[in-house]
């Protein structure tokens, strides 16, 4: 690792460039340099202060190894109460909501595409504004803990996965019905809930069967396991009760495995 300091010059290798998000509104270039100088010589700091949106920056090092060290050392770093998001920029910059339809509301959208790390500690977010990206959502949800995956869909919903279960639980308690702001300044109040067994899996396939139970008071309960696609024919397949006087209540329970 070489010495610190900002060296002004032509842009270098993209492997040397990192993205820094979730910065405080009063951040200065010198403040960013102070956070990253120990990782190596800095070629350039490009601070973006957008009206109505949180600032972010691109920091370019002389050596790609220093950039990698900075990502590992400063991602999630608490700076003046703000948990920094530090990562390598992703290629294929995109805008707007994803195309396509059906399923979970269309293809994913985002400025650089969602990260690939996944977790079972997942929440579903609804009520996102049209310009909200996965990065905006990830920044918002990181107030509750370490986010390892975030994605958004064109129907205004999103999915967020946390590293730890307690962070997921805290996110529902702290961030449900909070004000969300996109990188374009659009705001909306969002709802956050734990992804339950009946919620969309957003790309994770689940093998399911339907357990059908017929509960009859005064008679023996009957149960059968049938494929989910046959559930709609349920009433045609269940046996009728011979003596209606014995029936007090009849109910069907569908349990997705």
Swiss-Prot record:
Cellular localisation: Cytoplasm; Nucleus speckle
Domain spans labelled RRM: 16-91, 121-195
Pfam families from the UniProt entry: RRM_1 (PF00076)
GO biological process, one term: alternative mRNA splicing, via spliceosome
Disulfide-linked positions: none
Residues recorded as bearing N-acetylserine in the entry: 2
GO MF annotations in UniProt: mRNA binding
Domain of life: Eukaryota
Task performed by this protein: May play a role in preventing exon skipping, ensuring the accuracy of splicing and regulating alternative splicing.
Record-stated family: Belongs to the splicing factor SR family.
Protein name: Serine/arginine-rich splicing factor 1
Organism of origin: Gallus gallus (Chicken)
Phylogenetic lineage: Eukaryota, Metazoa, Chordata, Craniata, Vertebrata
Protein's gene: SRSF1
